[in-house]
Amino acid sequence: MRCLTTPMLLRALAQAARAGPPGGRSLHSSAVAATYKYVNMQDPEMDMKSVTDRAARTLLWTELFRGLGMTLSYLFREPATINYPFEKGPLSPRFRGEHALRRYPSGEERCIACKLCEAICPAQAITIEAEPRADGSRRTTRYDIDMTKCIYCGFCQEACPVDAIVEGPNFEFSTETHEELLYNKEKLLNNGDKWEAEIAANIQADYLYR
């Protein structure tokens, strides 16, 4: 197979453009030339301005100082972040944070030991034990949540018929040991007592959509 040099290839393309495809519109050589890129063509000669710009970028680090100038300009602009933990952003009423067990205003715990939350939990993080009381009602004797298993899906809160188990607004509950993340009933009730005002406000704000 004979290799065509660049001049020969250009002449062949020009002849094909003048002849045109059968029954079709003829192609202009300029359009053909613009369509193809010839890898063996030499780069066009650079003028003095291009040489000067390239030398300035290489020797004077103009791009570096341009980037530093942009960085320094942000020192005089309004910050886009907040000064956490001294400042905190707003949370959605549907925010799913640390778990809590709620009480009625009388002080009676809401949980009726139906175990729907335990059954629906996809991570199997909830363990409940219950026994009947003298009045025939059921109350939990054990309510444990392994917070290291929890995926914060909110299914337990959605399944609860009495709004007993909720995921409250608190997200700052980091610990130093694994045992501190094994919540029992007392810990969950204490969380509910601590965050009841915020939890009730969030439920009230979201009740139309539940």
From Swiss-Prot:
Q: What is its main location?
A: mitochondrion
Binding locations of [4Fe-4S] cluster 2 = 150, 153, 156, 160
* Top-level taxon of origin: Eukaryota
Q: Which cofactor does it need?
A: [4Fe-4S] cluster
What reaction is this protein's catalytic activity? a ubiquinone + NADH + 5 H(+)(in) = a ubiquinol + NAD(+) + 4 H(+)(out)
Which residues participate in [4Fe-4S] cluster 1 binding? 111, 114, 117, 121
Q: In which tissues is it expressed?
A: Expressed in all tissues with the highest level in heart and skeletal muscle and the lowest level in lung.
Query: What Pfam families does the record tag this protein with?
Result: Fer4_7
SUPFAM superfamilies cross-referenced by the UniProt entry:
4Fe-4S ferredoxins
What does the entry comment about cofactor binding?
Binds 2 [4Fe-4S] cluster.
Q: What subunit structure does UniProt give?
A: Core subunit of respiratory chain NADH dehydrogenase (Complex I) which is composed of 45 different subunits. This is a component of the iron-sulfur (IP) fragment of the enzyme. Interacts with RAB5IF.
Q: Which family does it belong to?
A: Belongs to the complex I 23 kDa subunit family.
- Role played: Core subunit of the mitochondrial membrane respiratory chain NADH dehydrogenase (Complex I) which catalyzes electron transfer from NADH through the respiratory chain, using ubiquinone as an electron acceptor. Essential for the catalytic activity and assembly of complex I.
> What is the protein's name according to its record?
NADH dehydrogenase [ubiquinone] iron-sulfur protein 8, mitochondrial
